[in-house]
Amino acid sequence: YIFLSISLLLLFYIFYKAQIVHGGLESVYYLKYYYFSFSLIILSLFSFKLSKEIKFMISTVIIASTFSLYIAEIVLLKINNYEDTAIKKFALKKNPNFDLRSQYEAYMDFKRIDENYVNPVLPKHFIYDYNVKLYPLSGIPNKPVVSCNENGYFATYNNDRFGFNNPDNQWDIKTIDYVLLGDSATHGDCVNEPDTIGGKLRSYNNVNSLLNLAQAGNDQLIEYATLKEYMPTGKIKNVLILYHENNDLPGLSLSLKHPILKKYFDDENFSQKLKNKVTELKKIKEESMSKRTERGKKQQDDLDWIKANKKIYERRKLITLIRNTIVFTRIRTELIEGNRFEKAEEDVFKEFEEILMKYKKFLKAKDINFYFVYLPDIRRYIDNEKK
């Protein structure tokens, strides 16, 4: 009965995380955990038919394995807490004026200056929403955006008429020198627009026009869909894809599972005609932003409560630590999720090559130069130094 009770508690906890904490926004992500908990329930029911000797052996193995896992979990939690504290101390030492506001606090402060400010709405926010009628490939158009903080300040930029990080007049130029596609590094996450890759390239005298169609979290399929939906009508000289080896392929694995995005892969003529559906898209994007802002408010309310109730918080912190330890938070992050990314790379490499060939065919037919820029991850060199 103990095994069955634990299995049921696990199921309820997964439901709580998926539907209450995340508001159902990431239900697809939690499917594997639902399958796991149901499997445990079935096994626990089956165990009632086993003999006492076999039950004892199984229980011994489970208890020993669980004990070992908890030791590993505690060690990983200690290491993670140390790293977080060290990073914060280093940031403050390098920049005493490092902005320590939360994303929600910064957003609300910017809203007091200009009520038009919005939070980022990104294509990846819809990757687990299989019921969305239109799949957005950009942010909320014609709005100033409060970006993230990695350098001690909250970066801002203005979305153009289609929701991309560009000066809006770039769309009116008849001949486009460069179109950029990529993820956060190309999008310009956490830096102001003049400091983005697109902003730097525009500063060169020989670059007359450039459109940055990148969005944080994008992968090759989303980028391919973006190019097909938002291809400028005038002449384009060059298209550059900036590929980041650390996370683009795992992202592609998720995109290939989405029913709308998969159509771009299967059908070269498929289009959502997003340029003509600005009103419908705006509603979908604003609803998504509203949900995420509400989640940010809840997190901020929790932080404010912590500041006002430090003694009670210390008890709650202990409870949270125990809860995270019970569900193997760090082990899942370090091992299960890490292996998922490695497996994803193997599973989708063929599709990745096919998408590149689709790019080549699509752009060659329009007499556009195609460049693939490979951005290596820093861990490649750190790992080599360790070896």
Residues covered by each model-derived region:
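Membrane-embedded alpha-helical segments of integral membrane proteins
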Residues: I2-S47
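Serine-dependent acyl-ester chemistry module
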Residues: L4-H22, H244-K387
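Internal/C-terminal transmembrane anchor helices
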Residues: K52-K78
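Membrane/wall-proximal cationic-aromatic binding patches
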Residues: N81-Y204, R332-L335
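Conserved SGNH/GDSL esterase-like catalytic core that processes O-acyl groups on lipids
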Residues: Y178, H187-F270
